[in-house]
Amino acid sequence: MSYAGRRIGKAALSLCVTTALTVGVGCGVASATSFDAAAQPIDLGQTQVGMTIEQSQYIARQLKPVPLKVTLKKGPRRPIPEWAKSSIKPNPFFDNDAWRYVRKGYKPGQVMRQRKARWVKGYFPIAARGVQYAYVSYDSRGYPMTATATLVIPHHLKPNASVMEYNQFINSSGPNCSVTTQMNQLFSWGMMTSTIQMVGAALALGYPVLLPDGDGANNIYAINRVASHVILDSMRMVHEQHDFPLAKSHFVSLGASHGGMMTGYTAAEQPYYAPDLTAYVNQFVVNEGAPDLIKLAHSFGLYGELQNAPSVYGSFLMSFVVGAAREYPDLLPHLYQLFTPYGKAVVKGNRSICTPLTFAVGPGV
């Protein structure tokens, strides 16, 4: 298996290990039914709280190698399970209707709609202008999806100036957690602090800044092949948009924590998903990696009763479970049936909120 394949397989394995955190009794996939299941869904085996490495390896052996090049499709993707959907209705700007545009001939990175970034000067006083774009991208299986990004422009913009593409951490599943949403409201729940510092420095030096919403329109946390497509297509979007003279701009991609995961996957995916950008991406910089989710899940399993062994990182794991269920509903069609009442309550509380509120929910996991 390729390096990218191993990494994505590892993420899928982490989901399966994480599933054990909220189950009550053993339950195999074969014991349940679902009309929306894949032909061969993942069998989680006899899941339990103290899941062993051998049990997780049983799951891992079912995972197929990930193809390096995604085959792009035209039809809509599978719907998200009701239990994994956010209780907050997103703004129509984020409607996941890219497949309609693809059928009209739209290409990856092509702009579907745009709007002004309402509070760009509130967050970045040094900025001259900010525009938010919704554009065509593709999910991890090649289905069309809507992606969004904010382009912040400095004063005295030079034609084809190099662009800093910054991947903000999100760590949550709510629809109001994206940078694009945060920059259209006054209060950002602390999401924008590091972004303000990084972006302000780049703008002061005269560089435009690109801020994609790496989790996509469905707020899919930690499924980083999705994020890599969002990011690469945001670069294509910068070349395609007509508001600013950036058709030949080069990029430096930077991210920390969750943003670091997104940046690393983008570096691995770029030669296969967006070879046309090879000459335009100067560097990928992973400032800080995220914790190993598999080791994290196993360490939780050692405690047995997880309600009595709180960890702030439990919020990450719950966001990951929700994100994976949104991206791969057919591969894990019976996941919700394995949750205890406590696990269901944690998911319900986590699926619509942003960092740092997820930390308030997470310690009980």
How does the language model describe each region?
Residues 13, 21-32:
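C-terminal segment of classical bacterial N-terminal signal peptides
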Residues 194-197, 221-243:
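Alpha/beta-hydrolase active-site loop
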Residues 236-307:
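Primarily recognizes the serine-hydrolase "nucleophile elbow" in alpha/beta-hydrolase
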Residues 148-151, 159-172, 176-181:
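Short beta-strand element of the alpha/beta-hydrolase
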Residues 180-209:
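Short amphipathic alpha-helix adjacent to the substrate-entry channel of hydrolases
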Residues 42-98, 290-365:
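Accessory cap/linker subdomain of secreted extracellular hydrolases
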